[in-house]
Amino acid sequence: MEERSDSEPTPGCSGPGPAPVRDGGGAHTWAPEDAWMGTHPKYLEMMELDIGDATQVYIAFLVYLDLMESKSWHEVNCVGIPELQLICLLGTEIEGEGLQTVVPTPISASLSHNRIREILKASRKLQGDPELPMSFTLAIVESDSTIVYYKLTDGFMLPDPQNISLRR
């Protein structure tokens, strides 16, 4: 393998080199600046947030692609929350609806009740409407790029009646 002379770490990146690489703890670390996504404008925008490491940026980018391409969300933007060291995605699932906060996280991450509460509060600020109930969608990303979404709220939420199918 040829060594690159310009292999300085990118801000927010754990280091140069192709991805994925498995470290001793079994978790994946990614540094895909040589891959096509390393030149994608949204990936570069996430890197410029200078939050977290290459793994967090990679996971956020995978969730972004899933929301835009598979789930056909109308608009998705990335926002950094420096005090929580998080990259969040803000978007609208359907044009004209309110903003939703999506928090990409690796499957290996552990979230305490306090951490979830901090994310709920930050999400409310990002959505800009203090009247809305505190909520965010947790996007859990597996090492094979499988993504599972869970909506977390502050307390119980009744389901939207139009989304309930009637049984007969």
From Swiss-Prot:
Disulfide bonds: none
GO BP: any one term: mRNA processing
Record's keyword terms, sorted: mRNA processing, Nucleus, Phosphoprotein, tRNA processing
InterPro entries in UniProt: tRNA-endonuc_su_Sen15, tRNA_endonuc-like_dom_sf, tRNA_intron_Endo_cat-like_sf
PTM annotation (Phosphoserine): residues: S7, S165
Superkingdom assignment: Eukaryota
Gene3D superfamilies the UniProt entry points to: 3.40.1350.10
Compartments reported by the entry: Nucleus; Nucleus, Nucleolus
Protein task: Non-catalytic subunit of the tRNA-splicing endonuclease complex, a complex responsible for identification and cleavage of the splice sites in pre-tRNA. It cleaves pre-tRNA at the 5' and 3' splice sites to release the intron. The products are an intron and two tRNA half-molecules bearing 2',3' cyclic phosphate and 5'-OH termini. There are no conserved sequences at the splice sites, but the intron is invariably located at the same site in the gene, placing the splice sites an invariant distance from the constant structural features of the tRNA body.
Quaternary state and interactors: Homodimer. tRNA splicing endonuclease is a heterotetramer composed of TSEN2, TSEN15, TSEN34/LENG5 and TSEN54. tRNA splicing endonuclease complex also contains proteins of the pre-mRNA 3' end processing machinery such as CLP1, CPSF1, CPSF4 and CSTF2.
Family: Belongs to the SEN15 family.
Name of the molecule in the record: tRNA-splicing endonuclease subunit Sen15
High-level lineage: Eukaryota, Metazoa, Chordata, Craniata, Vertebrata
